[in-house]
Curated annotation (Swiss-Prot):
Belongs to the Bcl-2 family. The keyword Mitochondrion applies. Residues 1-32, 71-131 are annotated as: Disordered. Interacts with MCL1 and BCL2A1. Interacts (via BH3 domain) with BCL2 and BCL2L1/BCL-XL. Interacts (via BH3 domain) with NOL3/ARC (via CARD domain); this interaction prevents BBC3 association with BCL2 and results in CASP8 activation. Induction: By DNA damage, glucocorticoid treatment, growth factor deprivation and p53. InterPro entries: Bbc3. Essential mediator of p53/TP53-dependent and p53/TP53-independent apoptosis. Promotes partial unfolding of BCL2L1 and dissociation of BCL2L1 from p53/TP53, releasing the bound p53/TP53 to induce apoptosis. Regulates ER stress-induced neuronal apoptosis. One of its GO terms (molecular function) is ATPase binding. The BH3 motif is intrinsically disordered in the absence of a binding partner but folds upon binding. Folds when bound to BCL2L1. Also folds when bound to MCL1. The keyword Phosphoprotein applies. This is Bcl-2-binding component 3. One of its GO terms (cellular component) is mitochondrion. It is found in: Mitochondrion. The gene is Bbc3.
Amino acid sequence: MARARQEGSSPEPVEGLARDSPRPFPLGRLMPSAVSCGLCEPGLPAAPAAPALLPAAYLCAPTAPPAVTAALGGPRWPGGHRSRPRGPRPDGPQPSLSPAQQHLESPVPSAPEALAGGPTQAAPGVRVEEEEWAREIGAQLRRMADDLNAQYERRRQEEQHRHRPSPWRVMYNLFMGLLPLPRDPGAPEMEPN
C-alpha cells in the first residue's frame, strides 16, 4: 500500500488489513427522502404520502433547539404535551412562522383531536390500519414458524430413514450371525486385534 501511495495509484483494498481511516457510513441512505416531509430540510422533494395518511407522531420533529421550540409554544419533543390550546391567540398579533413551523403547527385534517393537546392519540382510521398490519404481520410470522417447524420435522424424519438400515440388511446380518462360518481347524474363534 505504501508503494501504491508513492506511485500515485489508488491501493486495492486487501482483506485482513485495516484501512488508514474508517469510511463513514452514508447516513443519507438510512433516511430516504420519502421519510422526510420535505419542508423541514431544504433541498428535499416533498414526500409522496399525503399528511392526512400519517398520524401526528410520524411528522418531522422541529429542527430548532428545545428552548427555542418551547418559547414558540411548540412541543419539547414530538408527540409531547402542549401548554396552550390550538386556535388564534386573542391577546396579540401572530408571530411569523417559517414554513417548517407552519407545517408542524398545521393540524392533520383526518385527526384534529390528535394535535389538540394532551397526549398524542392516533386517528381512529390509523389505529385500525396499524392493528390490521399488526394482525397480518403476526399471521405471517405464525405461518413462517409453522413452515419452519414442518420443514424441520421432514428433515428429521428423512435423517431417521436415511440412517435406518433396510430390512434386507437386517435379515442378512441376522442370517450371517446365526450361520457358522467355515473355519480352518487351527484358526482361532475370534481374531485378535
